[in-house]
């Protein structure tokens, strides 16, 4: 359940370290974002000498939440932190590597590139 | 019309409720069994009041409107209640699953290795080595919670114990814990398994 002002870790090597969510993308003005939702975020902390800099507004897709993700087969998944992957307006990740396990739901939401880069899809 | 003898055995106090089927069996050996069964099927269900036998027998022919009946307190036979029936169904379903697959005893503190079919991945996730941190018993819907470290991030997952997606569960190690729910492991960086 990510909302505005939520800090998120970054799960790729795009150059950002920490993001703060400022807006959830969606026509119905959603209050919370879950795994697979796109958010608009500002970079609060960045790795030096990379294309992305601090206080830059970018879009990201949420890949890990502390709030449980429920599946139809009864399996419930819960991560220990909130994390996102920085993407461009088309939905392609800006980085070249993705860290951590990625939920399989992202594949159905057309984030296939992120899923293919993931070390483990669960 | 004399009350047939079998009627007296049916008009019972609530203590002999459980023995009622037996009394019916006894009646079957009697010569006038046919008469008794065709005569009265009503009171068998309604003899559940606590007030006393004389209040319950309603002879269809003989009640006069002057007799005031005390209020009936109905309660169901325990083996007819929905709760009991659901318990039986649940046990049957659990036994059916246990016949197909061998599901070991899983308790918190066990380190298990499971093979799960993940439909999203279209393949088996083979080595899921995790520590069981909780177990919830609810018949067929029993679930257990496992925790593992994936690429530096802790992941907890709740699985239904009798889920067909779980191919195999193997207990690797049993750690001594003094809790039923090991949620304190979330704060510890180094889970027990190391």
Curated annotation (Swiss-Prot), chain A:
One of its GO terms (molecular function) is structural constituent of ribosome. Keywords: Chloroplast, Plastid, Ribonucleoprotein, Ribosomal protein, RNA-binding, rRNA-binding. InterPro entries: Ribosomal_uL14, Ribosomal_uL14_bac-type, Ribosomal_uL14_CS, Ribosomal_uL14_sf. CDD domains: Ribosomal_uL14 (cd00337). It is found in: Plastid, Chloroplast. Its main location: plastid. GO terms for biological process: translation. It comes from the Eukaryota. One of its GO terms (cellular component) is chloroplast. Binds to 23S rRNA. Part of the 50S ribosomal subunit. Belongs to the universal ribosomal protein uL14 family. This is Large ribosomal subunit protein uL14c.
